[in-house]
């Protein structure tokens, strides 16, 4: 007759051996798999993908030009892209997308908010801001002169927050 402690050790060894056997077969198609792996196929080009998400991303690339054989449609689409620009009504900077203009407009709104944000009024009078310059690329950039004279020019700046910053 086998002692109780020996029986527990044998059961644990068997369980461990079974677990190791299962782990060694990870990736193989054994038992319940049946070779029935799911494949997602693109209806346009018949390319196959392992996940629905990958297929969805691929399908989006087919939808860029629906009627590419119609030259009048292609011409109107290309003309529309070049004509579309979104100018800022405040400073005149043009953006290729409305979303970029929206982010830019946030800057103008933040300048107008009083009591919660520091605005341009904290700059000393000696700081110069040059006008927007237009380069050959068609983009406008602001040129700021950041050459401050010394720390004395920074003393006692009055901010719109009502506080005074002073360095001693």
From Swiss-Prot:
GO terms for cellular component: nucleus. Disulfide bonds: none annotated. Keywords: Metal-binding, Nucleus, Repeat, Transcription, Transcription regulation, Zinc, Zinc-finger. InterPro entries: Znf_C2H2_sf, Znf_C2H2_type. Induction: By H(2)O(2), heat stress, wounding and cucumber mosaic virus (CMV). Plants overexpressing ZAT7 show retarded growth and development, and enhanced tolerance to oxidative stress. This is Zinc finger protein ZAT7. It comes from Arabidopsis thaliana (Mouse-ear cress). The lineage of its organism: Eukaryota, Viridiplantae, Streptophyta, Embryophyta, Tracheophyta.
């Amino acid at each position: 007759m086998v002692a109780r402690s020996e029986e527990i050790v044998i059961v644990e060894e068997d369980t461990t051996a079974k677990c190791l056997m299962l782990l060694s077969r990870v990736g193989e198609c054994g038992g319940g798999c049946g070779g029935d792996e799911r494949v997602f196929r693109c209806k346009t080009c018949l390319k196959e993908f392992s996940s629905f998400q990958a297929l969805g991303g691929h399908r989006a690339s087919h939808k860029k030009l629906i009627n590419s054989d119609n030259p009048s449609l292609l011409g109107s689409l290309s003309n529309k892209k070049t004509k579309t620009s979104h100018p800022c009504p405040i400073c005149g900077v043009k953006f290729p997308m409305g979303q970029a203009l929206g982010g830019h407009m946030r800057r103008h709104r933040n300048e107008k908010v009083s009591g919660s944000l520091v605005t341009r009024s904290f700059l000393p009078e000696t700081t110069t801001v040059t006008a927007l310059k237009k380069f050959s690329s068609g983009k406008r950039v602001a040129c700021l002169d950041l050459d401050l004279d010394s720390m004395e020019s920074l003393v006692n700046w009055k901010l719109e927050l009502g506080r005074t910053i002073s360095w001693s």
